[in-house]
């Protein structure tokens, strides 16, 4: 069952939001992610909903490399909103950097370690001495993957060539290029952090038999090194063709804005998240989402925008 759908069906946006056109921005932009991934799907749905319900005159989603790029787009002013992993959003800010704030936790990201089923790799330890796609530069995956490999006690080498001592050869490829390389045999594994199922992985599974590695044993070390922003989550059986249920590491996805975004836009967007959650869940999703009143405010230590906090208090007491 998709979280938030019951709420969305039972409640419509307050007439004050729908009727309020004065003072709304002409355009809003939502920094998303790579084609074939949940970030861009979610951002496109959010942009359409923002426009449909009059939060802005128009709204559009931006294709980006992922979380780190999105935060940079936000700070530069090129994006109004950004979707980002909690671990990326929670990194220490450089002195003088534009502050970001959360509007809410929107859904769970699942770290996928994808291998070919005939590779003989059945555990993360089997990646030693292999070529591994660790995420596109600017993506949240490119931040999370080195943390996972370090937690597993695996060392890496740059330049795409495995080291003599079993070092993993790091290849900076994102989702689509990484899947192409996996099919071609030029990488042995692909890391990707996204929703379940990720459409591009589903499509790739039609052409080659895939497997996912269990990463849940790394959780305690990850938390010891980086805090409690990581979770143990289950990729359900049937999420991908022929892939059984597998435990992995998850992290929350947050909807972010600049801390100086005007209160009216923030409040109207929060109302949309609460009252129209059903419009924001991709069709391909299994519904393992955070778009519910109980979880929206749990932003993994990233502060809520003051207007968002006020809106949640008004909506839920």
Task: Name each region found by the language model.
Residues 1-19:
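N-terminal export signals
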Residues 15-30:
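C-terminal region of N-terminal signal peptides and the immediate post-cleavage residues
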Residues 27-53, 57, 61, 109-184, ...:
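Bilobed "Venus flytrap"/periplasmic-binding protein-like clamshell domains
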Residues 35, 79, 86-88, 106-108, ...:
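Solvent-exposed coil/turn segments that connect beta secondary-structure elements
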Residues 48-55, 75-79, 150-154, 183-187, ...:
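Sec-exported extracytoplasmic/periplasmic mature domains
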Residues 74, 79-81, 99-107:
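Short beta-strand-centered segments that line the small-molecule binding cleft or hinge
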Residues 86-89, 95, 119, 157-255, ...:
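Pocket-lining segment of extracytoplasmic ligand-binding domains
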Residues 244-317:
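Segments of small-molecule ligand-sensing domains
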């Amino acid at each position: 069952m998709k979280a938030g759908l019951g709420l969305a069906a039972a409640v419509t946006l307050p007439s004050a939001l729908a009727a309020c056109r004065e003072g709304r921005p002409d355009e809003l932009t939502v920094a998303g992610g790579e084609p074939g991934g949940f970030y861009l799907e979610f951002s496109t749905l959010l942009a359409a909903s923002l426009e449909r319900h009059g939060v802005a005159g128009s709204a559009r989603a931006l294709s980006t490399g992922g979380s780190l790029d999105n935060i940079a787009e936000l700070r530069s002013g090129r994006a109004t909103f950004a979707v980002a992993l909690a671990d990326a959003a929670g990194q220490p800010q450089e002195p003088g950097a534009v502050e970001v704030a959360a509007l809410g936790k929107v859904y769970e990201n699942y770290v996928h370690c994808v291998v070919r089923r005939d590779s003989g790799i059945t555990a993360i330890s089997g990646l030693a001495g292999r070529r591994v796609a660790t995420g596109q530069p600017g993506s949240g995956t490119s931040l999370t993957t080195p943390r996972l490999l370090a937690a597993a006690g695996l060392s890496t080498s740059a330049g795409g060539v495995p080291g003599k001592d079993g070092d993993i050869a790091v290849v900076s490829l994102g989702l689509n290029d990484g899947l192409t390389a996996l099919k071609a045999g030029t990488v042995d594994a692909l890391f990707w952090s996204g929703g379940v199922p990720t459409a591009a992985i589903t499509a790739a599974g039609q052409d080659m038999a895939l497997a996912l590695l269990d990463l849940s044993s790394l959780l305690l070390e990850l938390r010891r090194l980086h805090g409690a922003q990581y979770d143990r989550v289950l990729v359900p059986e049937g999420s991908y063709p022929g892939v059984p249920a597998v435990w992995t590491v998850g992290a929350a996805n947050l909807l972010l804005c600049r801390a100086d975004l005007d209160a009216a836009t923030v409040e109207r967007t929060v109302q949309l998240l609460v009252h129209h959650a059903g419009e924001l869940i991709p069709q391909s999703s299994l519904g393992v989402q955070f778009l519910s009143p109980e979880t929206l405010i749990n932003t993994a230590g990233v502060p809520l925008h003051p207007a968002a906090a006020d809106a949640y208090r008004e909506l839920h007491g």
